[in-house]
Swiss-Prot record:
GO MF terms, alphabetically ordered: chitin binding; metal ion binding
Topology class, membrane: Single-pass type II membrane protein
CDD domains assigned to the protein according to its UniProt record, in alphabetical order: FReD (cd00087)
Residue ranges of the region described as Disordered: 1-22
PANTHER family membership: FIBRINOGEN C DOMAIN-CONTAINING PROTEIN 1 (PTHR19143:SF45), FIBRINOGEN/TENASCIN/ANGIOPOEITIN (PTHR19143)
Designated name of the protein: Fibrinogen C domain-containing protein 1
Length: 459
């Protein structure tokens, strides 16, 4: 219909313009064609916009998009044709008498190709039927995402701070490591110096030991009541020690009553009648750990335990025995592999020169070592007896409390026969039944027995 109207208008214009001159008609035709071409371009752009708008709306995806095409430059052909979804066509025509607009058509075809390409790319993208709901969900998620982003930023700042602190800590540790290495180096030097000093002290002690034996013997001989005794009991049925019991005819080991010179009330003791000729008065025994030896001063002064088993005779009684004559000491030892050793001391006494032996702490006098166990007692000679509640040693600490025993500690010990019964090798240091010269400071012996006997005239 548009085409027919265009023809009618064209015919009328030809009839009316016949009297006019040709230049005027050509000018009008040129203007009219230009206007129509502009309208066609605007219409094509408008149609393209409508198509894009329709593609963005939530319409069912089954209807095909409109098809836009252009015609050729021949007569009676449409400039632009739009085929709608309902198969109807919209055509824009142009008068064939218009000037040659081949370049314009080429530009329009380029525009058409761009529009079609844009439509094709747009249609290739998936349609978002739930776009509003998605936008609402995104709007709901956005605050949480922002909050989480803030939290992550804070965590990142914390991690940076922690990294900085770790760096500072590593620097500090490196400094401490250097300082410790320096201290260890200095300690090694001090240790070497200490070892040399200890070696010098040991050599001096050995020299003093060699020089001190005659002096100790002289002191023991000067003790008024410690002369050599004749055989047999001084007053018939009252033996002063186990040697008197042996000389009275008793040959069996066991418990007997004795009556020392300075202890007329008497007390019972266990007598060893077999070792080295017999006649030994036992004052200490460890054999099974059944008796607690970690006790105080009063218990060690009075004695405790069972005479036929583990026991300590008592400092008061040992003093009474060793002040009535010159005594020798024999120490029997056994480990948990049934190995045995002994230590013998030719001179032994407790509180020999004390007016008040308890006040003086029952000091030890011992000399003249021989045997197979090695000497671990001479270092303690001259020391007072120390218990956990009465400290008489030369250490800053209480050796009895520290090494869980009671002994004539110096600083602190080379033997600890009244220590804990730890049954062989142990991780702790020097707190077992120890005789260091034989088994070291980390082995607790299975058996120990300390016994005394008067020095006989025939020796």
């Amino acid at each position: 219909m548009v085409h027919e109207r265009w023809k009618t208008v064209g015919s009328a214009s030809q009839l009316e313009d016949r009297p006019r001159d040709k230049p005027q008609r050509a000018s009008c035709s040129y203007v009219l064609c230009t206007v129509l071409l502009s309208l066609a371009v605007l219409l094509a752009v408008a149609v393209t916009g409508v198509v894009l708008f329709l593609n963005h709306t939530h319409t069912p995806g089954t209807a095909p998009p409109p098809i836009v095409s252009t015609g050729t430059a021949g007569a009676n052909s449409a400039l632009v044709t739009v085929e709608r979804a309902d198969s109807s066509h919209l055509s824009l025509l142009i008068d064939p008498r218009c000037p040659d607009l081949t370049d314009s058509f080429a530009r329009l075809e380029g525009i058409q190709a761009s529009i079609l390409r844009a439509l094709s790319e747009h249609q290739a993208q998936p349609r978002l039927d739930g776009a509003p709901e998605l936008l609402d969900a995104l709007a709901d998620q956005l605050p949480r995402l922002l909050t989480r982003a803030s939290e992550l930023q804070a965590e990142c700042a914390g991690l940076r701070k922690g990294h900085s602190l770790l760096g500072q800590g590593l620097s500090t540790l490196q400094s401490e490591q250097g300082r410790l290495i320096q201290l260890l180096s200095e300690s090694q030097g001090h240790m070497a110096h200490l070892v040399n000093s200890v070696s010098d002290v040991l050599e001096a002690l050995q020299r003093e030991r060699g020089l001190g034996r005659p002096r100790v013997k002289a002191d023991l001989q000067r003790a008024p009541s410690r002369g050599a005794r004749p055989r047999g009991c001084a007053n018939g049925s009252r033996p002063r020690d186990c040697l008197d019991v042996l000389l009275s005819g008793q040959q069996d080991d066991g418990v007997y009553s004795i009556f020392p010179t300075h202890y007329p009330a008497g007390f019972q003791v266990y007598c060893d009648m077999r070792t080295d000729g017999g006649g030994w008065t036992v004052f200490q025994r460890r054999e099974d750990g059944s008796v607690n030896f970690f006790r105080g001063w009063e218990a060690y002064r009075e004695g405790f335990g069972k005479l036929t088993g583990e026991h300590w005779l008592g400092l008061k009684r040992i003093h009474a025995l060793t002040t009535q004559a010159a005594y020798e000491l024999h120490v029997d030892l056994e480990d948990f592999d049934n190995g045995t050793a002994y230590a013998h001391y030719g001179s032994f006494g407790v509180g020999l020169f004390s007016v008040d032996p308890e006040e003086d702490g029952y000091p030890l006098t011992v000399a003249d070592y021989s045997g197979t166990a090695g000497d671990s007692l001479l270092k303690h000679s001259g020391m007072r007896f120390t218990t956990k509640d009465r400290d008489s040693d030369h250490s800053e600490n209480n050796c009895a409390a520290f090494y869980r025993g009671a002994w004539w500690y110096r600083n602190c010990h080379t033997s600890n026969l009244n220590g804990q019964y730890l049954r062989g090798a142990h991780a702790s240091y020097a707190d077992g039944v120890e005789w260091s010269s034989w088994t070291g400071w980390q082995y607790s012996l299975k058996f120990s027995e300390m016994k005394i006997r008067p020095v006989r005239e025939d020796r």
